[in-house]
């Protein structure tokens, strides 16, 4: 009986594929990577210029993908975990369907979205540790999942 219990317990661990971490960038105080957090993997490219430092940088994120749905209404569910402490999930509306700030909000299914989004961390102090952010993109009136990405940030500030 014991071999059966051990086999049934270890079998899922043997055949479970570990999620591949895709490198984002490596700066002087942080390492950024992401992986897919659902089974709907599709080509998605994200790069930062310059690579993000959490001690106060600003720059641009270059994002490129081909949506599987029209982007008339788009929002993100953002779940953040800081050093194993859960922060309440935040819903961030990106495209309302009218009077939108981003040009890609009118993109149709199958059109390539190639956009640049500014970022800034000036004035924000991040404690040392590991940050995880799950960004789940939801589109349309039927609220269909467009994609889900799991970002990992390891912050290792230099102590001088």
Curated annotation (Swiss-Prot):
Q: Which GO terms describe its cellular component?
A: extracellular region; lipopolysaccharide receptor complex; plasma membrane
The record's region (Interaction with lipopolysaccharide) falls at 119-123
Record PTM: N-glycosylated.
Q: Which UniProt keywords apply?
A: Disulfide bond, Glycoprotein, Immunity, Inflammatory response, Innate immunity, Secreted, Signal
What's a Gene Ontology MF term here?
lipopolysaccharide immune receptor activity
Q: State where the protein is found.
A: Secreted, Extracellular space; Secreted
Residues annotated as glycosylated: 26, 77, 101, 150
Supply one GO BP term.
toll-like receptor 4 signaling pathway
Pfam families named among the record's database cross-references: E1_DerP2_DerF2
Please give the InterPro entries that the UniProt record associates with this protein: Ig_E-set, LY96, ML_dom
Spell out the disulfide connections: 25-51, 37-148, 95-105
- Signal peptide residues are 1-16
The record's note on quaternary structure and interaction partners says: Heterogeneous homomer formed from homodimers; disulfide-linked. Belongs to the lipopolysaccharide (LPS) receptor, a multi-protein complex containing at least CD14, LY96 and TLR4. Binds to the extracellular domains of TLR2 and TLR4. Ligand binding induces interaction with TLR4 and oligomerization of the complex.
PANTHER family with a match to the protein in the record = LYMPHOCYTE ANTIGEN 96 (PTHR15218:SF0), MD-1, MD-2 - RELATED (PTHR15218)
According to its UniProt entry, the function of this protein is described as: Binds bacterial lipopolysaccharide (LPS). Cooperates with TLR4 in the innate immune response to bacterial lipopolysaccharide (LPS), and with TLR2 in the response to cell wall components from Gram-positive and Gram-negative bacteria. Enhances TLR4-dependent activation of NF-kappa-B. Cells expressing both LY96 and TLR4, but not TLR4 alone, respond to LPS.
Recorded protein name is Lymphocyte antigen 96
Q: Which gene encodes it?
A: LY96
């Amino acid at each position: 009986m014991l071999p059966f219990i051990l086999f049934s317990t270890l079998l899922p661990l043997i055949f479970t594929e570990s999620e591949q971490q895709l490198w984002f960038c490596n700066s002087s105080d942080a390492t950024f990577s992401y992986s897919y957090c659902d089974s709907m993997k599709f080509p998605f490219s994200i790069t930062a210029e310059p690579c993000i430092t959490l001690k106060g940088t600003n720059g641009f994120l270059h994002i490129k993908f081909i949506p599987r749905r029209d982007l008339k209404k788009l929002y993100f569910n953002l779940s953040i975990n800081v050093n194993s402490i859960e922060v309440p999930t935040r819903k961030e509306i990106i495209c309302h369907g009218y009077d939108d700030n981003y040009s890609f909000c009118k993109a149709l299914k199958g059109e390539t979205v190639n956009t640049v989004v500014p970022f800034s961390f000036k004035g924000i102090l991040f404690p040392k540790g590991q940050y995880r952010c799950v960004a789940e993109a939801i589109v349309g009136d039927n609220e269909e999942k467009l994609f889900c990405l799991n970002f990992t940030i390891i912050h290792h500030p230099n102590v001088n």
